[in-house]
UniProtKB/Swiss-Prot annotation:
<dbReference type="Pfam" id="PF13306">
    <property type="entry name" value="LRR_5"/>
</dbReference>
<dbReference type="GO" id="GO:0005615">
    <property type="term" value="C:extracellular space"/>
</dbReference>
<feature type="repeat" description="LRR 6">
    <location>
        <begin position="232"/>
        <end position="253"/>
    </location>
</feature>
<feature type="repeat" description="LRR 1">
    <location>
        <begin position="93"/>
        <end position="114"/>
    </location>
</feature>
<dbReference type="InterPro" id="IPR032675">
    <property type="entry name" value="LRR_dom_sf"/>
</dbReference>
<keyword id="KW-0325">Glycoprotein</keyword>
<comment type="similarity">
    <text>Belongs to the small leucine-rich proteoglycan (SLRP) family. SLRP class I subfamily.</text>
</comment>
<feature type="repeat" description="LRR 9">
    <location>
        <begin position="303"/>
        <end position="324"/>
    </location>
</feature>
<feature type="repeat" description="LRR 7">
    <location>
        <begin position="256"/>
        <end position="277"/>
    </location>
</feature>
<feature type="disulfide bond">
    <location>
        <begin position="323"/>
        <end position="356"/>
    </location>
</feature>
<protein>
    <recommendedName>
        <fullName>Asporin</fullName>
    </recommendedName>
</protein>
<feature type="repeat" description="LRR 8">
    <location>
        <begin position="280"/>
        <end position="302"/>
    </location>
</feature>
<feature type="repeat" description="LRR 10">
    <location>
        <begin position="332"/>
        <end position="354"/>
    </location>
</feature>
<feature type="repeat" description="LRR 2">
    <location>
        <begin position="117"/>
        <end position="138"/>
    </location>
</feature>
<dbReference type="GO" id="GO:0031012">
    <property type="term" value="C:extracellular matrix"/>
</dbReference>
<dbReference type="GO" id="GO:0030282">
    <property type="term" value="P:bone mineralization"/>
</dbReference>
<dbReference type="InterPro" id="IPR000372">
    <property type="entry name" value="LRRNT"/>
</dbReference>
């Protein structure tokens, strides 16, 4: 018996400390995020080196922490607790608050009062229907706000001017008001897919003065490409909408665009010359549409490397549809051309058609099924 007890004791003493994987993963992600962001604050680090983390005690056991939550290195982790409201006693020096997967219905005026160092706020997958106009009055350093999978009917007004990334995917937003992003010069990423937004819901001037680089409005009710999005766009994703035609003037405003997503729409025609307005584009998604031919102008896009055209109604591929006809024209080699699941007879496609691809593995043909 004594030997058994001794063995158990030795086993417990030699056991490694228990870490929850999500804590360390979350910390690493936020560290990388802060490095990428290049925050110019005097206190640049989310996990300051002057407060080293003891691997045997990953949580700060002595500071104030909301009941049921876990606090460590200026991160307050309160997800998956069934909370119906934002907890009190969040430390004032908190940099990140994780409240996802709860049952919070409302953000009140003082829920985040005094959190002047808050950098990221995660409220995904709650039941939010209302956010007080003054809820973010003191969070002047907030850079990332995640509100996806809630029941918000509009984008909150009076968001912090410091915000760089807003994700409000899968809500009930039908309108983007003119004043929504006023003064938000730091906003670079806007993700608002899976909202019942149509073209009339984007008020004229809604994006005036903002320098957004990435916008995703997929799974919405758009019937055409919005023409008044920021001219600074590098990525535009409008997949899973109801767009039927790409008109000549649709991309005239977006000359710096590098990635374009128009997959899973109803596009039957791309007007000649329309793609010439995005000369810097590198990747185009047009899969799962109703195109009957390869869009014209691809051979003139010297930076284009990826083009997805699978699952359309393309019956013919010309020898000059993808590659330049001018021998001296320098063009990036294609790393992916997807033409699979089209009624084109692949044995009729001339080998010279793909003379500007990286390798034959870069081309996908065949597998058409009626």
């Amino acid at each position: 018996m004594k030997v058994y007890v001794l063995l158990v004791f030795l086993t417990l003493c030699s056991a490694k400390p228990l870490f929850h994987p999500s804590y360390l993963t979350l910390k690493n992600l936020m560290l990388k995020d802060m490095e990428d962001e290049g925050d110019s604050d005097a206190d640049n680090s989310l996990f300051p080196t002057r407060e080293p983390i003891n691997p045997f005690f990953p949580f700060d056991l002595f500071s104030t922490c909301p009941f049921g939550c876990q606090c460590y290195s200026r991160v307050v982790h309160c997800s998956d607790l069934g909370l119906s409201s934002v907890p009190s006693n969040i430390p004032f020096d908190t940099r990140m608050v994780d409240l996802q997967n709860n049952k919070i219905k409302e953000i009140k005026e003082n829920d985040f009062k005094g959190l002047t160092s808050l950098y990221a706020l995660i409220l995904n997958n709650n039941k939010l229907t209302k956010i007080h106009p003054k809820a973010f009055l003191t969070t002047k350093k907030l850079r990332r706000l995640y509100l996806s999978h809630n029941q918000l009917s509009e984008i909150p007004l009076n968001l912090p001017k410091s915000l760089a990334e807003l994700r409000i995917h899968d809500n009930k937003v039908k309108k983007i008001q003119k004043a929504t992003f006023k003064g938000m010069n730091a906003l670079h990423v806007l993700e608002m897919s899976a909202n019942p937004l149509d073209n009339n819901g984007i008020e004229p001037g809604a994006f005036e003065g903002v320098t957004v680089f990435h916008i995703r409005i997929a799974e919405a009710k758009l019937t055409s490409i919005p023409k008044e999005l920021p001219s600074t766009l590098l990525e535009l994703h409008l997949d899973y909408n109801k767009i039927s035609v790409v008109e000549l003037e649709d991309f005239k405003r977006y000359k710096d665009l590098q990635r374009l997503g128009l997959g899973n729409n109803r596009i039957t025609d791309i007007e000649n010359g329309s793609l010439a307005n995005i000369p810097r584009v590198r990747e185009i998604h047009l899969e799962n549409n109703k195109l009957k031919k390869v869009p014209s102008g691809l051979q003139e896009l010297k930076y284009l490397q990826i083009i997805f055209l699978h699952s359309n109604s393309i019956t013919k591929v010309g020898v000059n549809d993808f590659c330049p006809t001018v021998p001296k024209m320098k063009k990036s080699l294609y790393s992916a051309i997807s033409l699979s699941n089209n009624p084109v007879k692949y044995w009729e496609v001339q080998p010279a058609t793909f003379r500007c691809v990286l390798s034959r593995m870069s081309v996908q043909l065949g597998n058409f099924r009626k």
